[in-house]
């Protein structure tokens, strides 16, 4: 009897060993640990999308991957994000391409004042542009997704209904948004976001131009009672992975990450748009702000004044041997397509 029990136990062990040998090694091994660097503070939308992507990858790989996230520049800063990922200081990094306009010429074309209606449309357009042209500046990394912030709009202590209202108006702005405001006749003033509330209170600036979640997040609605919608520029972002690290991943893990590219671009844009909507509703309910929408004729006048900015960019890009007009054409086509949904 004891001999038969021993034989049955041995047989069960052999079966277990055989079944175990059939399991993929990736499911038996310890989780693959990856580091993900980000530069803005944890509550901001680039970090919110980072945490969402982390959870999706960990869930869809069945625990094969464990991702440690580093917001707020704790691992890599904004200006050295791309080079830091290439060097392997972080496995994954999120960068704002607008901070290096000359380096990311193709994808930064989405920062031109083409009139994106929201972040979802802009994010999907950016992703389409990248996938079509596969710019050489990303040859040393694996691009996981791209997305944008919401379009910049004007909020001020005085109403802006026409170009005449905008003329000479001091507004806090930076980068491409500042260039657009200058073209429209305003006076852009560069300053950190943290200094803007005091500058508004003291009258150093009469308002600002940025995406409208700041009305609630920075409480600008307490001071600026007028919002003018003109669908200004967006800032493009990219999430990239060290190429050696990417090549070391199991094929099934690569497939999960690659499959999230378009979904993550849409999710981030949609999250941003919902946050903007919430901010605007909060501002209307709690601070009675007025939303000013330009009429077709007035909007056409604004668009006419920013056209030279687009033409200047085309000239610069063509000088670098890039098919600049094709980029702008494709951006407009993609914008119109994604705006239908």
Q: Could you say what each language-model-derived stretch is?
A:
Residues 30-120, 136-341:
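N-terminal secretory/targeting leader peptides
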């Amino acid at each position: 009897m004891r001999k038969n029990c021993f034989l049955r136990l041995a047989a069960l062990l052999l079966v277990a060993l055989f079944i175990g040998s059939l399991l993929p090694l990736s499911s038996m091994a310890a989780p693959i640990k990856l580091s993900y660097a980000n530069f803005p503070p944890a509550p901001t939308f680039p970090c919110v999308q980072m945490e969402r992507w982390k959870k999706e990858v960990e869930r869809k790989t069945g625990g094969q991957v464990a991702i440690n996230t580093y917001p707020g520049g704790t691992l890599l800063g904004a200006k050295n994000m791309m080079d830091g990922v290439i060097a392997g200081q972080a496995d994954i990094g999120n960068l704002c391409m607008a901070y290096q306009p000359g380096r990311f010429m193709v994808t930064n074309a989405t920062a031109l004042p083409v009139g994106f209606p929201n972040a979802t449309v802009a994010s999907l357009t950016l992703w389409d542009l990248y996938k079509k042209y596969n710019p050489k500046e990303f040859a040393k990394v694996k691009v996981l997704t791209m997305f944008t912030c919401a379009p910049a709009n004007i909020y001020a202590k005085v109403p802006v209904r026409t170009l005449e209202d905008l003329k000479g108006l001091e507004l806090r702005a930076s980068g491409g948004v500042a260039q657009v405001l200058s073209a429209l006749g305003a006076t852009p003033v560069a300053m950190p976001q943290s200094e803007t509330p005091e500058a508004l209170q003291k009258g150093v600036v009469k308002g600002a131009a940025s995406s409208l979640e700041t009305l609630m997040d920075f409480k600008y609605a307490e001071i600026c009672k007028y919002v003018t919608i003109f669908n200004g520029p967006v800032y493009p972002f990219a999430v990239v992975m060290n190429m050696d690290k990417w090549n070391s991943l199991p094929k099934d893990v690569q497939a999960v990450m690659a499959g999230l590219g378009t979904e993550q671009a849409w999710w981030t844009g949609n999250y941003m748009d919902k946050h903007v909507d919430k901010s605007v509703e909060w501002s209307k309910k709690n601070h009675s702000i007025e939303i000013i929408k330009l009429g077709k004729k007035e909007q056409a006048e604004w668009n006419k004044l920013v056209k030279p900015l687009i033409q200047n960019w085309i000239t610069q890009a063509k000088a670098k041997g890039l098919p600049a007009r094709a980029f702008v054409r494709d951006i407009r086509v993609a914008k119109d397509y994604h705006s239908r949904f």
